[in-house]
Amino acid sequence: MSIRTILFDLDGTLIDTNTLIKASFEHTFKEYNLNFSNEEILKFNGPPLVDTFNKIDETKADRMITTFREHNIREHDNFVTAFPHVYDTLEELQNRNISLGIVSTKMRHTVHMGLELTGISKFFSTIITYDDVTHAKPHPEPVQMAMQKLGAHPEHTLMVGDNHHDIVSGQRANVQTAAVAWSLKDTNYLKSFHPDYIIEDIKDIITIVGDSFA
């Protein structure tokens, strides 16, 4: 099926926020006298903050979320950059009349901070954030909402992400899925969720789009 719409996760997929997120978790855990290994912190990267902190301590979750977000916003511009070839790839997709959207588990404010800082906001016709949905990824609602706003059809849509919940959300919404090999998650781990594609470089999407019209 030809691909006419591409939905992207943001953090870890288009922009590199990994160091910022790790630093924000470490800052928060230090404030609350909690100790987690790097491996454990890695697992916290991706799901909504409310889910992560509720699992740690429901009685302190709201305060920990506030601490995390304050640090994350304060340090944001010191850490965040776009991954290589992202700008040129998005520009080429736009030139090919591919509809582009963002589907993120972050709050709208911080999503826009990242998009504006890296100069890629102009490429996206819709942006779905944690604030916009009742059920975050891996529920299909965010992907379905993005498609509805773009007038897209599942059979012509691709969801691209760096985490299993991106892949599962896309699959539950009956769209094609692609996992990125530069994810902090092990590639074999992502393969276990059976995405349609594993991309080594964001530019690979150009080939996928071209092949879909062949």
Curated annotation (Swiss-Prot):
Gene3D superfamilies in the record: HAD superfamily/HAD-like (3.40.50.1000), Putative phosphatase, domain 2 (1.10.150.240)
Active-site residues, Swiss-Prot/TrEMBL: D9 (nucleophile)
Cysteines engaged in disulfide bonds, as pairs: none
InterPro entries, per database record: HAD-like_hydrolase_sf, HAD-like_sf, HAD-SF_hydro_IA, HAD_2, HAD_sf, PGP-like_dom2, Pyrophosphatase_Ppax
Domain of life: Bacteria
Molecular function in Gene Ontology: inorganic diphosphate phosphatase activity; magnesium ion binding; phosphoglycolate phosphatase activity
Stored CDD domains: HAD_PPase
Nucleotidyltransferase listed as a keyword: no
Catalytic activity: diphosphate + H2O = 2 phosphate + H(+)
Keywords in alphabetical order: Hydrolase, Magnesium
Cofactor: Mg(2+)
An example Gene Ontology CC term for this record: cytosol
GO biological process: DNA repair
Enzyme Commission number, as recorded: 3.6.1.1
EC supergroup of this enzyme: hydrolase
Entry annotated with the keyword Magnesium: yes
Its biological purpose: Hydrolyzes pyrophosphate formed during P-Ser-HPr dephosphorylation by HPrK/P. Might play a role in controlling the intracellular pyrophosphate pool.
Family the UniProt entry places it in: Belongs to the HAD-like hydrolase superfamily. PpaX family.
HAMAP family: Pyrophosphat_PpaX
Record's protein name: Pyrophosphatase PpaX
Organism: Oceanobacillus iheyensis (strain DSM 14371 / CIP 107618 / JCM 11309 / KCTC 3954 / HTE831)
